[in-house]
Swiss-Prot record:
It is found in: Cell membrane. It comes from Coprinopsis cinerea (strain Okayama-7 / 130 / ATCC MYA-4618 / FGSC 9003) (Inky cap fungus). This is Plasma membrane fusion protein PRM1. Residues 652-675, 830-850, 960-991 are annotated as: Disordered. Belongs to the PRM1 family. PANTHER family: PLASMA MEMBRANE FUSION PROTEIN PRM1.
Length: 1062
């Protein structure tokens, strides 16, 4: 590429990556802020729908009110429909009443006439009988006197006797006829007919009276009135007015009748009350709903603004954490005691930047906060590395930006909706009473409208009905009882005339006699009092005989207030909502409409949250698979394989060298491992079955909560599968001739390479590639047998194609000023053993360990972590070592350094801006490129040959600090202490120290390919998948104070803050 070969033509202040100001300018696009904005927009949509619902509620309320007006009009028109049905009944009742009144009046008059006739006839009969008694008694007295006289006067009395007897016979006949006539009209029974026997006047035959006396008696007999004449006259006088009244009654009632068709019917009256409808409660509820929604939107916007500010701080904090991580990485790579060097002190450190290392670095840089949280959780919960890896993967998985966006949208949306739904209850309670009052007032309005309409109709109807009643009443009074004025007076006159006739008759009979006064008094006492009573009765009839028909009240067609309220309450409830059903009235419907829209939005946010839940379930499934499922499947496959193969054949497969005192590992047992002698049995490459388990790589040395590890009692290593490199399937014929030549110089044969190639021809399947990463840790691992970086970098076999990158953090000038001759006298250190395996770094980042002298009196390790900017003294149990200086600097290479570029940048030949620079002053020797580079070249061997092979197997190495960690801080060599390695900058180097050393940090193994040609070669096994971030919590870092920093050096402005925060 051109930018690798040519320097830039123009100077620019921009970089290819975003710096802090650029990141701060994008803080408003964070997922939480976008989630809040999304929720605010959804709430705004709900607010618009609520406003539409309010308008719709008012429209529906008016429409309901119109319908209520129609219903109220129908209710108010009840008098019309009541009158239509009532008029016929009223007419029938009036007509029946008239017919009954006529019959009653006629019957009454008939009975009255009979009673009057009876009374009059009774008095008449008594009078006539008494009169006859008096007359006949007087005549009998006279006859007796005459007989006495006739006895004297025989001649006179004989004639008188005959005449008297004849008169008595006539009297008997007349009396009999009279009594018979009375019996014919007497309803109380027959009156016996008295018989007057003629007196015996034989003695008067000889007596005769004078003629004048006899003529006077005959004349008296002729003057007595007859009974039949009086009777006929009384009947004519009494019966005539009654007959007239009866005829008038019949004629009057025949002309009077009530017809339902002629009765009035009220008109339908329309009720109107919607113009007086109070809609303020709807407006108040709507305003409160809109107000609450707007408050929610404003709160969301305020929270969004606050989150923007907090996100700026958070972005600054992440930038600071990233800078701290970069400082960790830079100083970790520089101070790693296992860093591979090129045979000289000034050689460039080489690290293995595999895909795994870069992916871990990228993940940590992408999620620094998640990484920090997981590290702290692991430290506090004292989780195992496997559990820590799973937890960090799980958090990175479920908080992947799209998944985190779903989570935030769902949580913020549901939280806001639930808050609004909870606020609906107080809102309903607030306006429920007001709505009830409004409904009550509306009911009263409807009731008053109905009452007013019904009162008007009832008044008109009653007036018309009463007019008809007055007409009928006048007709009856004038036509039926008009005879009173014309008959009462004549009847009274008739009775008076009857009384006068009786008195005249008595006067005629007894006038001039001694009985006149007695008879007159008797008639007055017997008949006069009764006549007076009859006159009074007729006068009462004249004054009171009138028909008063009942009138119709003005409120006859009105309903009672209870009935009107009962009729108007459902109408008001239908219009306003009564709250007795599911809609909870007007307020309930209005609030429920908005609540329903919120519930629909809740479904949307619930879907977002469910999507994040699906991601969580997927992550849990993946964790379950890699922690339980896959190991079980691999175990089943291995058991099936072992069962199918039975006893493994001997020969062909070489087991790495192992000390005889340690028990065989599981890999050696499964593959026919050797005995205590060290070299195991071999198996031919042709006999290797497919999916043969390979020796597991060294597990991660990351232990954020490091405890001194206790070795397994059995000393048996656990099986962990090795993940193949991306170049695992490169064919063996692609090995270059140069590599073959280098193998020959190393004393290796092609057979060993072929054996290694055949051993890796059948890599484990995809299912078992990551078993070593997620496998369960049963106990502390024993030393694994894995091809070291030195062998892989020298042989470049098919399983290793990891690039070698030189990372330089020090300039040449700084190295000369800082390091000086710190390693110049390293060859003079006594007791140095090139075969003694050096300690494995806590950082475990570089592909190969760097050989250093452990007889130095004082070694200082660098680390970015600091506490209060003070140097920490070396303590027991912690090891320190100086950094490895780089080979050259930008100044030495001739590249002009920009003032804004730190001295650590552009100091490597791998840098694109150094591609066109001339060859450095001190190029790397060619020999390390051809011959295998020793793993520990910091101190030369005693015979000054760093590449010689030992003729015998090495002694078992036991690191002194494993048993006694304080040995590193003591001067074990007795020689003068060499100067500590200092950083390339002008300020004192920061000090880092391993605070929790463990025995598993120093694991030795022999490469399988070198056992045949190199029976004694001790290599340090390392895990190529470890990054400096894995051991972050195992190192304490002390940075120098700010006052000691060189002013000309570009300084990270967040270094102190990062150190304090971290």
């Amino acid at each position: 590429m051109s930018f690798l070969t040519t320097p830039p033509n123009e100077h620019t202040t921009l970089t290819s990556y975003l710096q802090l100001p650029h990141l701060l300018s994008l803080t408003w696009l964070a997922y939480p802020i976008l989630s809040l904005i999304f929720v605010a927009f959804r709430l705004q949509a709900s607010l618009a729908s609520s406003e539409d619902a309010i308008s719709s509620a008012k429209s529906n309320l008016l429409a309901s009110c119109k319908a209520a007006e129609e219903a109220a009009t129908s209710t108010a028109s009840l008098p019309r429909y009541m009158a239509i049905a009532t008029n016929q009944q009223v007419a029938d009742a009036v007509n029946a009443t008239l017919r009954g009144a006529r019959a009653a009046l006629i019957l009454t008059l008939t009975v009255m006439e009979a009673i009057i006739n009876f009374i009059i006839d009774l008095y008449r009969s008594i009078f006539l009988c008494f009169l006859e008694l008096v007359v006949r008694g007087g005549i009998a007295i006279l006859v007796g006197a005459v007989e006495e006289i006739n006895n004297v006067l025989a001649t006179v009395t004989s004639g008188l006797r005959t005449q008297i007897q004849a008169s008595v016979g006539t009297l008997n006949n007349a009396l009999r006829e009279t009594i018979e006539g009375i019996n014919r009209i007497n309803p109380f029974g027959d009156i016996p007919v008295p018989t007057f026997d003629p007196p015996n006047l034989d003695g008067l035959d000889n007596v005769s009276l004078p003629d004048s006396f006899q003529e006077s008696l005959l004349r008296l007999n002729d003057t007595i009135p007859t009974v039949s004449t009086i009777k006929e006259k009384l009947q004519d006088i009494i019966g005539t007015p009654f007959e007239l009244v009866k005829r008038d009654i019949n004629d009057t009632f025949a002309a009077v009748s009530f017809s339902a068709d002629t009765l009035p019917v009220p008109e339908q009256n329309k009720v109107s009350f919607c113009s007086d409808l109070d809609l303020s409660v709807v407006d108040d509820v709507g305003n409160d709903i809109v107000k609450s929604a707007k408050i929610g939107i404003v709160i969301l916007l305020v929270i969004a603004l606050v989150l923007i500010g907090l996100n700026c701080l958070f972005t600054w904090y992440k930038w600071r954490c990233m800078q701290a991580h970069l400082e960790y990485t830079r100083q970790a790579w520089n101070t790693d005691p296992t860093m591979q060097t090129k045979g000289s002190i000034s050689a460039t450190p080489q690290i293995a930047l595999s895909n795994h290392n870069l992916m871990v670095l990228q993940a940590n840089s992408e999620h620094p906060l998640v990484t920090r949280i997981t590290n702290q959780l692991s430290q506090k919960l004292r989780l195992s590395p496997r559990t820590h890896t799973h937890m960090q993967w799980f958090f990175n998985y479920i908080f992947h930006p799209p998944a985190a966006a779903c989570l935030l949208i769902g949580v913020f949306g549901l939280l806001l909706i639930e808050i609004q739904l909870l606020a609906m209850g107080p809102l309903v309670n607030k306006y429920q009473e007001q709505a009830a009052e409004t409904t009550k007032d509306f009911s009263l309005l409807i009731a008053n409208s109905i009452n007013e309409s019904m009162l008007n109709q009832s008044t008109i109807y009653a007036a018309e009905i009463n007019g008809r009643v007055d007409s009928v009443q006048t007709t009856i009074n004038d036509g039926l009882f008009g005879w009173v004025d014309g008959t009462i007076v004549p009847l009274n006159t008739t009775i008076n005339e009857f009384y006068d006739d009786i008195q005249n008759a008595v006067q005629t009979v007894f006038g001039g006699t001694i009985l006149e006064t007695a008879a007159t008094e008797f008639i007055r006492c017997l008949i006069g009092s009764k006549v007076d009573a009859v006159e009074n009765a007729l006068t009462f009839l004249h004054e009171n005989l009138r028909v008063d028909m009942p009138r119709v009240n003005d409120t006859a067609l009105m309903l009672s207030p209870e009935s009107v309220n009962e009729a108007s309450a459902p109408i008001a409830a239908a219009a306003m909502g009564g709250g007795t059903d599911d809609d909870q009235g007007l307020i309930g419907r209005l609030v429920n409409s908005y609540a329903d829209s919120l519930r629909k939005e809740r479904v949307t946010f619930g879907i977002f949250l469910a999507l994040w839940g699906v991601v969580v379930l997927m992550g849990l499934f993946v964790l379950f698979w890699h922690s339980t499922g896959k190991p079980l499947l691999e175990k089943r496959r291995r058991r099936k394989y072992e069962k199918s193969k039975g006893m493994l054949p001997e020969g062909g497969f070489v087991v790495p060298y192992r000390d005889g005192s340690a028990p065989p590992s599981r890999d050696e047992k499964n593959l026919g491992g050797g005995g205590n002698g060290g070299v195991g049995l071999a198996m031919t490459g042709d006999e290797l079955p497919q999916f043969t388990p390979l020796p597991s790589p060294r597990r991660s040395a990351f232990k954020p909560f490091w405890n001194p590890a206790k070795p397994d009692a059995s000393g048996e290593a656990k099986d962990v599968e090795k993940e193949p490199s991306p170049m695992a399937q490169v064919a063996a014929d692609e090995v270059s001739k140069l590599k073959a030549f280098r193998l020959k110089l190393m004393g290796k044969s092609t057979e060993s390479l072929d054996a290694d190639s055949k051993a890796s021809d059948n890599p484990p399947g995809l299912f078992g590639k990551v078993k070593g990463v997620f496998g369960k840790k049963d106990a502390d691992q024993a030393p694994d047998y894995w091809t070291s970086y030195n062998a892989s970098s020298d042989t470049v076999n098919a399983n290793t194609a990891r690039p070698n990158i030189r990372v330089i953090v020090d300039t040449d000038q700084d190295r000369e000023d800082t390091y000086g001759n710190s390693f110049r006298h390293s060859a003079d250190i006594e007791g140095a053993d090139i075969y003694t395996p050096p300690p494995n770094s806590r950082w475990s980042t570089s592909p190969g360990p760097t050989k250093t002298s452990w007889n130095l009196k004082k070694l200082t390790l660098l680390s970015p972590k600091s506490s209060n900017n003070k140097k920490l003294p070396a303590v027991s149990g912690s090891s320190s070592i100086g950094p490895i200086p780089p080979s050259m600097s930008a100044a030495a290479s001739g590249l002009k350094r920009q003032p804004s570029v730190p001295t650590d940048i552009g100091a490597s030949f791998d840098d694109p801006f150094m591609a066109s620079v001339s060859v450095p002053r001190k190029p790397s020797p060619i020999v390390p490129g051809i011959y295998p580079v020793p793993l520990h070249a910091a101190a030369p061997a005693i015979n000054n040959n760093p590449y010689q092979r030992a003729p015998s197997p090495p002694k078992r190495f036991v690191a002194p600090y494993l048993n006694d960690p304080s040995a590193l801080s003591r001067n074990t060599s007795g020689s003068s202490a060499s100067k500590t390695h200092r950083r390339s900058s002008s300020h004192p180097a920061a000090v880092w120290r391993v605070t929790n050393a463990a025995s598993t940090d120093r694991l030795t193994a022999s490469p399988m390919s070198s056992q045949v040609s190199l029976p004694a070669r001790m290599l340090t096994s390392e895990n190529p998948f470890i990054t400096p971030f894995d051991d972050e919590h195992r190192v304490e870092v002390v940075n120098p104070s700010r006052g000691e920093v060189r002013k000309s050096m570009a300084v990270n402005p967040f270094s102190n803050a990062a150190a304090v925060a971290i």
